[in-house]
Amino acid sequence: VSSLADVNKTPNWLDENGDVNTPYNGVEATYLPGVGSGSYAGSFNGGFFGQTEVEHPFNFYENINASNSQGVDMSVSATGVGTNGYATALSLLSNKDEYSFNLLMLPGVIDQETDHSPVVSQAIQLCEDRGDCFLVYDNTNLTDAVSDAKTNTEARNSSYAATYYPWVQIQDATTGNFRFVPPSVVMAGVYHFNDVVGQPWFAPAGLNRGGIDSAVRAYRKLTQANRDDLYDSNSNPIASFPGQGVTVFGQKTTQKKASALDRVNVRRLLINLKTFVASSSRGLVFEQNTSNLRNQFLNVVNPYMEQVQSNQGLNAFRVVMDDSNNTPETIDRNMLVGQIFLQPTKTAEFIVLDFVVQPT
């Protein structure tokens, strides 16, 4: 999804039966979980090459499964287009020179579905291998309980992925009908809004940046105990508050080990920094490996790190690229080595206030 406007256009694709409106036929493929590059246009309906549109009506507000394939063959076979089709798409996205993106979502692919789980596994592996993108995935069906979300989330362990619960209801702008969609459909807009009004290293959650304006209501209204149970299992709750609408109220990754990287904002901070440093370093390749080259790197990276620090992304940092890590042996191996030490800022997720009544 390229902008928040694209997310808001989603309901216009549907008629009152939930099928694709004729004027949008062919356009929807741009936003479905496929990729387009040259002759490759996605994994739908058996077409790997030259196919640019979905050929049958679909209900985008429903999850894809064995009994409701929505035209997507999710079978596993050497020539099939199901998990192998998604595998082809994800393999293409592994080419960092060809594709540049920082968020990956697979609407309609539900992790708990047998045929979908390998797709989610490959998507997580893709993000970990690239190191410059983050996955938001779905792991529950519409009617699944809180306990299902907990169990399914606990089966994953990655700081490059996050999942949310429950599904939310959006309105078809054309007909006024209401449709339930998996969280990944609306989370694209939440992340986009967070980055526009804040920074990528801010938490895409809470009343200031986590509101889901397109959502009418959540499928389940979670109690505080529900939210706590979900958060303990690294599943991010979507809450409903009186007068404040539907709001994302969590920002954990699925990483099990407690560290700074078990939070979405910290992982996305590192993704942002890695992307900048990698881009800045590309022009240094094949230059003379002298102190001038090291200073050139420091003169680009340090100001950017200071900017991130001033925008509340870092408490402290230190960039080391000198004789201590660029020894004569290192230089003889045609290598330039740098180390970046970071102290990321943390979010306030629990506010404790003590009221003390004092005597007059």
Residue ranges and their predicted role:
Residues 1-360:
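Structured, hydrophobic secondary-structure cores that serve as assembly/anchoring elements
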